């Protein structure tokens, strides 16, 4: 089942509803032009050309799923950000949760080594030290962006940074101006990692509390993730294509309550490069 809410699409697969939103507006905010091409088998290619000569190229299948996203540098070099070969198959029909093929998650490290709470970070360098750590499980295959966004089991292979120092007003996706500086330490870590590997991708997860309708909360959480991504790009210069966003509504509450709870209105960061990039996965 598919329906729209607040310029976003709600897709129900089985018993779970996901929110999807086009990221072209965020990626193309600073561009000279955007070129759309139709390819064989219903595929499309979207090329964003920036004033500095950089091109961001996204190829999608007939369902809109991302097959490949690359950054083409002015000298012609290509940086692969993600590549999902299975989405390019002619017999591909619908998404299947890869968690069906995985055993239950067993965390074999202390929780403090799996989750970093930004509220207790004393040294900004801790963000870098944490994000450069490998996934907590072996990566069996190269996953797609959609796999990581939609499957909690796949996503949980990557450690997470809980940005508890950024909260949102009830029903709001706006970041308070006095909270923007709290992103600086994280932004420095992202910049450093991207400088070392321009193909890095970081997922920003948006969340809400449990008050309100599920669909509205999915859309709201997606806008929260997008707001943080825009701030990282506009204020700290993090390339938009190195950031992916996804809203999860009230599905993953930090505080188990059905009441209004600021700690549940939050964002979470994960470095998902090893899950979606062929070279990183091989390593």
Functional labels for PLM-detected ranges:
Residues 14-16, 51-53, 60-64, 72-74, ...:
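Solvent-exposed coil/turn segments that connect beta secondary-structure elements
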Residues 1-165:
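Low-complexity segments
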Residues 44, 53, 157-164, 171, ...:
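Envelope-exposed proteins and targeting segments
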Residues 178-180, 205-283:
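Periplasmic OmpA-like peptidoglycan-binding domain that tethers envelope proteins to the cell wall
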Residues 166-174, 211-216:
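Short coil/turn segments at secondary-structure junctions
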Residues 143-153, 161, 168-205, 229-234, ...:
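Periplasmic peptidoglycan-binding/anchoring modules of Gram-negative envelope and division proteins
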Residues 57, 69, 202, 241-243:
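Generic beta-strand hydrophobic packing signal
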Residues 49, 195, 259-260:
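Short polar/acidic secondary-structure junctions
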């Amino acid at each position: 089942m598919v329906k729209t809410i607040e310029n976003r699409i709600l897709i129900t697969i089985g018993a779970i509803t996901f929110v999807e939103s086009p990221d072209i507006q965020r990626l193309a905010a600073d561009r000279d032009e955007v070129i759309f091409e139709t390819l064989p088998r219903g595929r499309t290619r979207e090329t964003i050309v920036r004033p500095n000569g950089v091109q961001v190229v996204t190829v999608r299948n007939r369902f809109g799923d991302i097959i490949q996203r690359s950054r083409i540098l002015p000298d012609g070099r290509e940086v692969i950000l993600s590549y999902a070969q299975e989405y390019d198959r002619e017999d591909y029909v619908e998404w299947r949760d890869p968690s069906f093929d995985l055993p239950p998650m067993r965390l074999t490290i202390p929780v403090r080594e799996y989750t970093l709470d930004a509220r207790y970070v004393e040294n900004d360098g801790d963000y870098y030290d944490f994000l450069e750590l490998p996934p907590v499980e072996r990566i069996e295959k190269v996953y797609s962006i959609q796999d990581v966004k939609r499957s909690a089991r796949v996503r949980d292979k990557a450690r997470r940074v809980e940005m508890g120092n950024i909260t949102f007003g009830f029903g709001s996706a706006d970041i308070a101006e006095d909270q923007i500086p709290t992103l600086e330490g994280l932004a420095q870590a992202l910049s450093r990692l991207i400088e070392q590997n321009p193909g890095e991708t970081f997922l920003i997860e948006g969340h809400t509390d449990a008050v309100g309708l599920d669909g509205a909360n999915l859309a709201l959480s997606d806008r929260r993730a997008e707001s943080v991504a825009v701030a990282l790009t506009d204020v700290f210069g993090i390339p938009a294509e190195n950031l992916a966003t996804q809203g999860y509504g009230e599905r993953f509450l930090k505080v188990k309550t059905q009441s209004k709870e600021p700690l549940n209105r939050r964002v979470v960061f994960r470095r998902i490069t090893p899950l979606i990039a062929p070279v990183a996965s091989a390593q």
